[in-house]
Every structure is written in structure tokens, then in C-alpha cells.
């Protein structure tokens, strides 16, 4: 397998853990070998109000797919598992069965109309960084140069 990819997963509807596990299984079948998987974390919604908490996790995958192919495949998996939309027309977030974010593709920095790498908000989200630190504490943000552990410590110090 050629490239190491980090993905963040979250669900706040239905049987959350089962849905996240099913997404991870499908990723393993279609994107590449799942090398590491974090624990599941119960977190509050970010960027909007909801009574539904999230189940979040992170995984690392070794893949031969291109970044765009990874993105297309995880979006296809989201649709297969019942996710319809992640935002309202006004841009506000909504509850969802599954959300899969491509966080990092082997340290690639990319900014196209369909994909920005690394994920532009990952370093601002505790629910992303906590599971990422569990599986890859020494991962280095390709733009900021800080490790996952340093980024998470910074988020915790902001609070």
C-alpha cells in the first residue's frame, strides 16, 4: 500500500457505534487496510445545537487510491449508510447518520474546488484531535508543523 491516510468519523443518529463500525468495515474493503482505529468518543455537536451527542473515532488507512478517489469513496459510503446532507441551505450543520472526513493524505497539502488537505478545521476540533492523538500522537500537521499531541494540548489550553 502506498499512502497513509487519516480519516475522522462521526455519527449522532441511530445506533451510532454500529454505524461507525460499519463505515470502518466498508473503508477497509474499498479504500485500503485499516492500520489503526481509535476508541469511540462521546462528544457534543460542534457548530450547531442538537440534543443528539456524537460518537467520534479516527482511523489510519494505507491506500493506493488518489486523494480524490478516497474522498469519492468515503462520500459514497456515507450515502450507502443513509447520510443525506451535512448542512442546511444556510450553511448550518445538521444531525447525521455518518460523517467521514479525510483529515490527511500522507502529508499532502492540497487546495482544489473539491478537496482541501489537510482538513482545514481539524486542528480546531477536539473531537477530531482526541481520537487522532490516540492512534497517531506524533503525526505532524503538514502546514502548521505541530504534532497531533501539541495541537490537542493547544485546544485544551484554550478552554
Language model region names:
Residues 4-6, 10, 127, 141:
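Short glycine- and Lys/Arg-enriched binding-loop motifs that mark or flank ligand-binding interfaces
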Residues 2-7, 13-97, 107:
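Nucleotide and nucleotide-moiety/phosphate-recognizing core
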Residues 46-53, 68-71, 75-159:
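Flexible, gly/pro- and Lys/Arg-enriched active-site loops
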